[in-house]
Design a protein with these regions (language model features):
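Stable alpha-helical elements in mature extracytoplasmic
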Residues: 23-27, 62, 66, 99
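Axial heme c-ligation environment in periplasmic c-type cytochrome domains
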Residues: 47-54, 75-129
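Sec-dependent N-terminal signal peptides
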Residues: 3-12
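The canonical Cys-X-X-Cys-His
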Residues: 27, 31-41, 103, 107
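A contiguous binding-surface segment within folded domains or other stable secondary-structure elements
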Residues: 37-78
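Electrostatic cytochrome c docking/interface patches
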Residues: 13-30
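Hydrophobic residues within well-ordered, non-membrane alpha-helices that form the packing/core
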Residues: 10-11, 31, 107, 128
Length: 129
């Protein structure tokens, strides 16, 4: 049994890395279609109006809330991102759970962001408003 695990483990690891790579690429395309207008190509948003996604302390501290914002349409009330207050509500984009996962994987691995967490469709699907 141990030999089977040793044999299959590299394929499992490769498969995870490969699926993340595909998710990030799909997320990039979706970001360009749905997010770039407000958050800009560099993910920096507009200070005080549109929160940044690049180097965002909020994304890491409030991961689930960030995903819910994408899934259900914004966050109610004021948030503070990198020390700056924001109080504008993002529209619901109408993305499917797998697309939300892809966009989040792209955001979490772009513009200097690096996450070892893979957001999956199943994870997004379980989130309730």
């Amino acid at each position: 049994m141990r030999y089977l695990l040793i044999f299959f483990f590299p394929f499992f690891v490769f498969s995870q890395k490969d699926s993340l790579k595909i998710s990030i690429e799909n997320g990039r395309l979706l970001y360009d279609d749905f997010c770039v207008r407000c958050h800009l190509p560099n993910g920096k948003g507009e200070i005080g109006i549109i929160p940044p996604l690049a180097d965002s302390d909020f994304l890491y501290k409030h991961m689930e809330e960030s995903i819910k914002a994408l899934k259900f349409g914004g966050i109610d009330g004021e948030i503070i991102v990198n020390g700056v207050k924001y109080n504008s509500r993002m529209e619901k984009m109408g993305l499917y759970d797998d697309e939300i996962a892809d966009v989040m994987n792209y955001i979490l691995n772009s513009w200097g962001n690096k996450s070892d967490k893979i957001i999956t469709e199943e994870y997004v699907k379980k989130l309730k408003n």
